[in-house]
Amino acid sequence: MFKKLSSSLLIVSACVFSSCTPTVKQEIAILPTPVSLTEQSGSFVLKDGMKIGVSDQSLFPAIGYLQEILRNVISSSVEVTTDKNQVDMYFQLKDTGGKPGSYKLQSTPEYIRVEANDYSGIISAITTIRQLLPAAIEVQGEKQTYSIPVVQIEDAPRFEWRGFMLDASRHFWNKDEVKHVLDLMSLYKLNKFHWHLSDDQGWRIEIEKYPLLTEKGAWRKFNKHDRTCMARAKEEDNTDFLIPEDKIRIVEGDTLYGGYYTHDDIKEIVAYATQRGIDVIPEIDMPGHFLAAISQYPELACDGLIGWGEIFSSPICPGKDATLEFCRNVFKEVFELFPYEYVHMGGDEVEKANWKKCPLCQKRIRTEKLGSVEELQAWFVRDMEKFFLANGKRLIGWDEVVADGLSSDAAITWWRSWAKDALPTATAQKQKVIACPNEYFYFDYA
């Protein structure tokens, strides 16, 4: 989208400690600050051959994640069991009466015990254990002995939705880069990965029914931003600006930039995120920001009206039944790949001038007894929501759709900080709101 996040990877600096002391201890600094924390004297020392118990086999993936965190701490793999006796750490799913994601953590010199309402609470507790350890564990080096202070912690998330958005259309991030983002999200206890997979500049998700979306729609000629990056990489001898070769193709003499995610890539990333307690929220932006698709399937647009309007690109034609069917078919495949409650369909920054000139759009307005092209967009968004709900999904849209008559099942992403009425309007309609006003949350506005 025209205004979306400048996709940036958060960078966490890992400090390497060299010390003659046998045990490396960490000052207590947990982010976010727990609801309650009590520290006592003593510490729990991590050691080879530890035994970890779980109350339920569904926690095995979480313990696998813990083992990844500890890979630079202990030399041998830990033993995982469903027996709670004679274990060094025990993780238990238990109704603690708290909110989703809450947990209790107790460490003593002999053991660590965790109780959590659900899987996400277990992951948060594991992240707290990670933060109780020195940053040196994040890098591979000479093995040292690490300890965790004796503490009692009770914690619960303040916000249900703790998200990060990655725009993979303007700039394509490969599978390993996406996983790195998920690792950093987990470190900060973020739980919703908003994945912007389509826009004017590139289509990034394989749709088997429409192969041209990725065969051609995932690749673009170098634009001014791409050329500037490559020039600076050369001029400044700085590889940070260099576009990797795996994201470049030469086709008929043209240098093309792009890439996309196959179904297998997405399944792998979804599994990786799920292990870390993160939901993946895919976004297929429509009816605007759709030029990457329209360029390959021009019949989706109003006849003869493809390209750019005064500000934004030409949208799809909601007057054509075939266009509506295309949108539903795309989302059918998306629904199958993402086993989560919500899917984002955009709905922002739509250039509606074409609809005023399009006979089919005008016919749709008359047939549906609508009064304007604004109401035509609202009709399209409501029609898509009906399709979402029929397929067991809830729709999210950017705050431009707040006046489109969506049900209370929908959620609104409030990004326009100047749209002051969006938040109270959505809450009055009993719709959940994801607050990300651009003035505070967008990297390119910071």
Residue ranges of each PLM-predicted region?
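Structural recognition of the beta-strand scaffold that forms the well-ordered cores
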Residues: 162-165, 194, 282, 342-344, ...
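Conserved alpha/beta catalytic core and glycan-binding cleft of carbohydrate-active enzymes
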Residues: 402-408, 415-446
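Active-site beta-loop-alpha junctions enriched in small/polar residues
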Residues: 169, 198-202, 285-289, 348-350, ...
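Contiguous, structured surface segment used for ligand recognition
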Residues: 20-161
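Active-site neighborhood of glycoside hydrolase catalytic domains
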Residues: 293-299, 304-409, 416-419, 423
